[in-house]
């Protein structure tokens, strides 16, 4: 990855053939052992060890078992700015024995800080300043008086570099020593001597080895040995086989068999590259990450209409909220959090997984295999839901183990079984029995308000669930469910298919599902999706270059700050194209991350993310179902302590997080939108004006790609792009003259964030009931009230910290 004449490259199981750089390359050991060889020496570097290769020095790298190293290359332009003497060489090898040496530690710190600054989108000036400082330290402390390369030696190396470039670009063509020498205007014997001296082998041997390395990779595919031979520049398959046997000790065919056997034998999971990079990042400068530059300024004049004109606001974010599983809804602390949320925010629907899971005990079988049904636990749940004024949004899943075709779960909880049914008639009997029971108990008119779905189609597409069910299986399940429900009552509503964005937008994803079930007479009554801003490596070509040979998380957070808006706009285009324009969209799950242990989600970041995304997307879908209300999620072992980075608006102890307080603020929104822009939104209800201000800062690339682990709660704010304060000036014109009561509600690290109050308490892991009560009481936004006298215009001016949100409510006083 290249930025400002600085190149970062993570090498993982990757060998570099003979090469050289015009600048200086530093190799920082991350994991295992890597060997860097020059003409003078071989250096094996392990974790936290550093070796620097001088400019115009030939080197090669060889990876040890499960090894990783970070290469940082500083360009000649950087060296020049550092006053690096021309042709100056250095001798810098920092073993682990130098961990107590101040200069060596300074080199490590500068490498780590430079790496982190790049990923935090630091401006070019600061990035280059740090790089120049590192280069200056290298030559001033590690150069020697006799370490200057002769000019003629540099010219020879440049010639060799040109020859190597020709070989590496024409290796699969007819290329020879004579042709290469002719193109470089030197003799055959001269090129031959240079190769022998600097590369340590002959021109022909180097070319054959390069061709073999490409051929080995091709043997992983299905092409014939003959095709591979000619594709890689060998004159015949016999020539290829002879060279291959000399190098690898077996024929290409035998080698391919060994590859297949190796692929069929599963390997235990290895450490993530993100774990390795902690070896580097532990040395990063811990200084404040917030910019000290002048604040960004937004100035806007907003003219209020004389009438109640304006775009109506649909409070789609209050239409639905999620808890994890049906069984979770029977837990006292979860019920208390639901009661509080209903009182302070007021949602319409409650969604959850697992109504058919074994721990709800609905599906039972007699000894002869005939089904019977037990609704004791389900009745307790649905009675409670309706008691607190919520409407059930019932996901029909997962699969009861006795009805499962495959016993499979991706979670720690054995009650969760993800599978196709083993008997269509029994599945339909289960669905019919449930619907009939609920209609008998709660009344048809009531149940018609409920919403039903089948569990997500993601499980038919995600790689780790490939054996569980196919696309065709999923469509059959949906169609069987649809027919059963509509047979009971045509006005009951069934939606699908709950796809992640990548699956929803894929040609063979949601589009295919909708067309297939429509063709069979089972079109969903509403379209459901799950919106997490994740993308594949291949969708980010810039980073793909950096990590193309790495192992990391299979999904990364999108760099698109407006991911939700763009995803829903694309989804609406698809609906139009395939004849589903009138079919409502429900975002049944929605969060800033798919990671269940993301401490940044406990911070003020989540408040700014929610305010920004709700105000951008409230009109893009009928429901925006936040995932989820509580940190209590019985998929994995529920961690101890108060804050662990769970999805919830509440901790498991019932402490409201900053995101919850943001939704409370949104509950004050007006009936109509007046105007909006990046960082601000103005609404109105009769003679009351609501102004929302927010300073959203996105994750930096280092964290988006999971190259920054977040385990220390004190580091939770170190994973965002470096940004300063935001100054917003709004001129509200067209107000009725008079005195206005001005309420100002502020949510930032000083007020409204339980996480930051917890940090102030020294982040205690064990908290008494009194401690929790104190934290709950202190986790309130700051409120200031004053009177503002206006002759028809009001000037609002404020500065926001990163992740800060504010609500200003203006209400004209009577008289």
Regions found by a protein language model. Give the residues of each.
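A hydrophobic/aromatic-rich effector-binding and dimerization subdomain
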Residues: 1-5, 57-122, 135-146
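Generic protein-terminus/edge-of-domain signal
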Residues: 1-44, 239
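Short acidic-glycine-tyrosine-enriched beta hairpin
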Residues: 40-55
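Short, Lys/Arg-enriched, Trp-marked, Pro/Gly-tolerant hinge/linker segments that flank
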Residues: 93-102, 120-127, 136-165, 169, ...
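Short, basic, alpha-helical segments at the C-terminal edge of helix-turn-helix-like DNA-binding modules
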Residues: 154, 207-220, 254-269
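Basic/polar phosphate-binding segments, predominantly the helix-turn-helix DNA-binding elements
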Residues: 166-168, 173-210, 229-251
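Non-catalytic accessory regions flanking glycosidase/transglycosidase catalytic cores in CAZymes
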Residues: 239, 254-395, 402, 406-451, ...
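Noncatalytic carbohydrate-binding groove/subsite architecture in carbohydrate-active enzymes
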Residues: 470-616, 620, 642
